[in-house]
């Protein structure tokens, strides 16, 4: 578990971040059921009263933590949510988006685990900004002439995200060097593209991806985090 330094309550912003950091560590380790305000407060180095001042209930703390993770994922994969708007399908670089998702998953397996556990427990997945944009973008793609007929955007979204977030766990990315993570990310992105290219996508519409799939693998370049 992450070793979180104690912070004084005199700095509310730093204290709030310390509490959220502790909550993220516990969520990644034990899931939502393993999070209590008292344990989070202890890990963050603050007293319970201070934790309750920032988050009145355990549920609000978990919700705030999940929102932070979702926003971080959104910025890393799609860009600034304040300026992105609804992207036109024809303008989306599918290979670049796939690469960004693969790199984020390889570099942040614990955050992806938090997000996935929270989404599975949510009564309304569409309330999550990252899921709404990811599934929504695939639905817009499925409705376009770039896709094969009959693509189920919801099922495809679950398949792609589950695979992207489980691969780093299988490959033990947390114990790998950066170069190894880049190579593992490339392998993941390559097979995601291959599955889509010859499944949901009309392959004749994507000559650049067809050409990429025919080349030898090279590690993914670093992508600036949002």
Regions picked out by a protein language model, each given a short descriptive name:
Residues 74-78, 119-147, 151-159, 187-190:
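Amphipathic alpha-helical packing segments from all-alpha helical-bundle domains
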Residues 102-125, 131, 169-175:
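Amphipathic alpha-helical segments used for helix-helix packing
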Residues 7-15:
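Short, Lys/Arg-enriched anionic-surface-contact patches
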Residues 2-3, 139-144, 166-226:
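C-terminal peripheral helix-coil segments that are non-catalytic and often amphipathic
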Residues 18, 22, 26-60, 64-65:
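Helix-turn-helix
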Residues 64, 77-111, 150:
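Hydrophobic alpha-helical connector segments
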Residues 101, 115-118, 160, 164, ...:
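Short alpha-helical scaffolding segments that buttress acidic/His motifs in well-ordered protein cores
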Residues 62-69, 127-130:
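Alpha-helical DNA-contacting segments of helix-turn-helix folds
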């Amino acid at each position: 578990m992450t070793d979180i330094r104690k912070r004084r309550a005199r700095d509310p912003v730093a204290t709030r971040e310390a509490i959220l950091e502790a909550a993220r560590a516990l969520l990644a380790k034990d899931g939502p059921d393993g999070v209590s305000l008292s344990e989070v407060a202890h890990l963050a180095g603050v007293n319970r009263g201070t934790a309750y001042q920032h988050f009145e209930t355990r549920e609000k703390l978990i919700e705030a933590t999940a929102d932070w993770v979702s926003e971080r994922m959104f910025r890393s994969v799609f860009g600034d949510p304040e300026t992105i708007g609804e992207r036109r399908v024809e303008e989306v670089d599918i290979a670049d988006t796939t690469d960004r998702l693969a790199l984020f998953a390889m570099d942040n397996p614990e955050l992806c685990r938090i997000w996935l556990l929270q989404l599975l427990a949510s009564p309304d997945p569409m309330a999550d900004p990252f899921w709404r944009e990811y599934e929504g973008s695939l639905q817009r793609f499925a409705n376009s002439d770039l896709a094969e007929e009959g693509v189920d955007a919801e099922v495809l979204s679950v398949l792609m995200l589950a695979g992207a977030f489980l691969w780093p766990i299988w490959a033990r990315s947390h114990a790998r060097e950066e170069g190894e993570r880049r190579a593992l990310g490339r392998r993941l992105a390559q097979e995601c593209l291959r599955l889509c290219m010859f499944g949901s996508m009309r392959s004749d519409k994507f000559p650049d991806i067809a050409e990429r799939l025919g080349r030898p693998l090279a590690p993914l370049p670093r992508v600036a985090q949002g």
